[in-house]
């Protein structure tokens, strides 16, 4: 028999040989506590009544006052006994509840241990290591495949990377020189704008006078 079977017994329900279960015993103790608590309340009321009666009779009826005080003392004694009994029962109930809790905890731990054992029955540490190695190999293979797929393929066309870079640098230099020439070219001086208003022409009469003078000059030169 396993250690848990020795602790809790094979039957599991009733404690050994038909005895009460912890739950039944705990419930009975609680019922007893409730009964004694009600008895306490009753005795406290009786003590209050006898004290009132003793004060009422006082010096008028000493015999009745003394009887009331005697009854009060008896009730107080019973109340003290019940207080002690309640303390004992409360201690016993708490101990039983703790024991029952520990029992349930151990049962559940045993149940979990059996479940774990059953889960590991078909496992072998060497097989686990082999499986983890297979997983690592497959992951590595997947990485290699992904890298191969993502690598650009020229489909038979191969180019010299250095030659392409040199050509690119040459094109960049040509473009740079062109931009510099455009920036440092001859500066053009803007011409003045042509006036939009037409200049006044010579008067027609003045032009005729000049023509007459020229003719007169020609005639004088011919007569000499």
UniProtKB/Swiss-Prot annotation:
The modification N-acetylserine is found at residue 2. Transmembrane segments: none annotated. Residues 8-19 have a biased composition (Gly residues). Widely expressed. Expressed at higher level in heart and skeletal muscle. Also expressed in brain, colon, thymus, spleen, kidney, liver, small intestine, placenta, lung and peripheral blood lymphocytes. GO terms for cellular component: amphisome membrane; autophagosome membrane; cytoplasm; cytoplasmic side of plasma membrane; cytosol; endosome; ESCRT III complex; extracellular exosome. Changing residue 54 to C: No loss of interaction with CC2D1B and forms a disulfide bond locking the protein in its folded closed conformation when exposed to oxidizing conditions. Signal peptide: none annotated. Pfam families: Snf7 (PF03357). Probable core component of the endosomal sorting required for transport complex III (ESCRT-III). ESCRT-III components are thought to multimerize to form a flat lattice on the perimeter membrane of the endosome. Several assembly forms of ESCRT-III may exist that interact and act sequentially. Interacts with CHMP6 and CHMP4C. Interacts with PDCD6IP; the interaction is direct. Interacts with VPS4A; the interaction is direct. Interacts with VPS4B; the interaction is direct. Interacts with CHMP7. Interacts with CFTR; the interaction requires misfolded CFTR. Interacts with PTPN23. Probable core component of the endosomal sorting required for transport complex III (ESCRT-III) which is involved in multivesicular bodies (MVBs) formation and sorting of endosomal cargo proteins into MVBs. MVBs contain intraluminal vesicles (ILVs) that are generated by invagination and scission from the limiting membrane of the endosome and mostly are delivered to lysosomes enabling degradation of membrane proteins, such as stimulated growth factor receptors, lysosomal enzymes and lipids. The MVB pathway appears to require the sequential function of ESCRT-O, -I,-II and -III complexes. (Microbial infection) The ESCRT machinery also functions in topologically equivalent membrane fission events, such as the budding of enveloped viruses (HIV-1 and other lentiviruses). Via its interaction with PDCD6IP involved in HIV-1 p6- and p9-dependent virus release. This is Charged multivesicular body protein 4b. It comes from Homo sapiens. The gene is CHMP4B.
């Amino acid at each position: 028999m396993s250690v848990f079977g020795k602790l809790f017994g094979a039957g599991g329900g009733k404690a050994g040989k038909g005895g009460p279960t912890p739950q039944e015993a705990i419930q009975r103790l609680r019922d007893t506590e409730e009964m004694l608590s009600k008895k306490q309340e009753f005795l406290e009321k009786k003590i209050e009544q006898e004290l009132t009666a003793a004060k009422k009779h006082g010096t008028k009826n000493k015999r009745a006052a003394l009887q009331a005080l005697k009854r009060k003392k008896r009730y107080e004694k019973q109340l003290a006994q019940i207080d002690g009994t309640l303390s004992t029962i409360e201690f016993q109930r708490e101990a039983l509840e703790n024991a029952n809790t520990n029992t349930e905890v151990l049962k559940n731990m045993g149940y979990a241990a059996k479940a774990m054992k059953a889960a590991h029955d078909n496992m072998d540490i060497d097989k686990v290591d082999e499986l983890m190695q297979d997983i690592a190999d497959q992951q590595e293979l997947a990485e290699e495949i992904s890298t191969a797929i993502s690598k650009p393929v020229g489909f038979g066309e191969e180019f010299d990377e250095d030659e392409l870079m040199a050509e690119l640098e040459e094109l960049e230099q040509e473009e740079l020189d062109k931009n510099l020439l455009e920036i440092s070219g001859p500066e053009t001086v803007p011409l003045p704008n042509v006036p939009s208003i037409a200049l006044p022409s010579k008067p027609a009469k003045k032009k005729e006078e000049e023509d007459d003078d020229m003719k007169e000059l020609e005639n004088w030169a011919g007569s000499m």
